[in-house]
Amino acid sequence: CFNPMTVELAEKAMKEYGEDPKIETNKFAAICTHLEVCFMYSDFHFIDERGESMIVESGDPNALLKHRFEIIEGRDRTMAWTVVNSICNTTGVDKPKFLPDLYDYKENRFIEIGVTRREVHIYYLEKANKIKSEKTHIHIFSFTGEEMATKADYTLDEESRARIKTRLFTIRQEMASRGLWDSFRQSERGEETIEERFEITGTMRRLADQSLPPNFSSLENFRAYVDGFKPNGCIEGKLSQMSKEVNARIEPFQKTTPRPLRLPDGPPCSQRSKFLLMDALKLSIEDPSHEGEGIPLYDAIKCMKTFFGWKEPNVAKPHEKGINPNYLLAWKQVLAELQDIENEEKIPKTKNMKKTSQLKWALGENMAPEKVDFEDCKDVSDLRQYDSDEPESRSLASWIQSEFNKACELTDSSWIELDEIGEDVAPIEHIASMRRNYFTAEVSHCRATEYIMKGVYINTALLNASCAAMDDFQLIPMISKCRTKEGRRKTNLYGFIIKGRSHLRNDTDVVNFVSMEFSLTDPRLEPHKWEKYCVLEIGDMLLRTAIGQVSRPMFLYVRTNGTSKIKMKWGMEMRRCLLQSLQQIESMIEAESSVKEKDMTKEFFENKSETWPIGESPKGVEEGSIGKVCRTLLAKSVFNSLYASPQLEGFSAESRKLLLIVQALRDNLEPGTFDLGGLYEAIEECLINDPWVLLNASWFNSFLTHALK
């Protein structure tokens, strides 16, 4: 019952998508119908030389007339987009996201035609929700003679629309007479959006129907309403229209509205990273070529032998809550067992420590409360969970800003090779590899990059040992590798970890470990930073300075700590921080390039005179070279990984909302808010005791001050 040209186009369209018209007959009929309606919509409509529209049905019209509608539907995709682009270029109309069906030269708008076997308003809302464009006009016809169009503007005269409705009625009758109509009517799917295809049945369906707001008869009816809900205009009105109980007063947000975040009081916060950062000291060997080079234990022993200033250890700063003699004994045991290894003919590849009382204590062996089967205790009358104490509030301490500043600095070694950031899966475009190389050059010597490689090494070694030697107290050297300025390889030892029992079944099961790390930092200078550590003095180191050699005490920072499979997995993937900060830099380059309409990568990295905003400090907006920007972004990403915590997650998510409001104010968008107090509460409940979160909050306050000046 369809026009032969329509049939041919519909077959072609389906084949383009790999569908068979003979199998998917309902879809085929729907495509044919839609094509016919589009052609009929444009038939006989012309525009005369004065731009007036007219209808000409008979033979030879005046040659000066121009077709009123451009037909886009029915062309192959490439051609269709070419037509759309040329219309947009000549008329200045916005380019639509989806291919429309027609363009109306009289009204200067694209038209989306819909033909539905369901109710027109439901189909209309689905279409509107899909194309989400104010500019494209929508016109829906149904087989029952109903129609619906944007703003009730039907574009065509009554008679032309009646022709279309009659044709649809005829198609329906012809299908019915062949027994095809029922199947065709029921086969219509909504516009393909994820929600539409998700069928809800059974109990869920009954629950959905029971929980509809008042005045809605069915879930579809409610969905159509929600999809058609345009979130512009006056919010108060929308809210009151939604429910009588809601009354949100929208308060204007002005420069004087926001107050600074309240940072907690209390003792200064303490270091909580899994390994030392700026305070770490390395024992290093250059151009390692010893036997077994690359085996951690061999490398560690070789590094230990480069130092000659060992002395009888003593406690320089006790751990307030711990048994300090045990920490001392643990270090002495490490020295003794390393000595034992050397006395053997063949050095083993791994070293398991003797399970001495000091190590059992430090690793919490037998400390876990005994597990009892629930069946045996469910009759206990006062069975309850432990009361856990609220975390104690801590105030911001200056050390965390110093840690961050140090992480942004350059070291005298390179910590990654050029190809460290992502392997090339495909031949990477020239620009992308150029950006990557420039970026790598800026960050390869950065201290944050050292932290990445150190973190990857420690987490990999610890996860390996946790799986391979579950019951053993394995000694794991903390090692990193780098290249000196002259390109010589270097192996560094930061200290040791001793791993506790590690039967890790779940991702969150904890493995305890004791870390022992070398340092030249005297813990008595900032004792609050080292609250969780017992610090031993273990030797004297000769340092070359401008005034000659000086001897400085060498310390060992010892603490018990713990981690889990999931944390180690993320620790092993710390190289992602390089990628994250590279992407942030790329978006800055993209922004520059789009303004200048050419790729600005080279200028961006090579123009040394230009400065860029790095961040806000109490002094104002800090600026620096592009290299400094790269390193600062990298350091932020690395600290987010090193100091990951629920407090950070909450603070980032909640403070971002306030940030967006302030930015909207800066851009003169006149933002309004309701329950700003609730937002402040949500942000401030994350400010408890975490050094990195507290530092970010104080940066946020600096930003508020300058943004609102």
UniProtKB/Swiss-Prot annotation:
Mn(2+) 2 binds at residues 73, 101. A motif (Nuclear localization signal 1 (NLS1)) lies at residues 117-132. One of its GO terms (cellular component) is host cell nucleus. It holds the Pfam family Flu_PA. It is found in: Host cytoplasm; Host nucleus. GO terms for biological process: cap snatching; symbiont-mediated suppression of host gene expression; symbiont-mediated suppression of host mRNA transcription via inhibition of RNA polymerase II activity; viral RNA genome replication; viral translational frameshifting. Binds 2 manganese ions per subunit. Belongs to the influenza viruses PA family. This is Polymerase acidic protein. It comes from Influenza A virus (strain A/Chicken/Shantou/4231/2003 H5N1 genotype V).
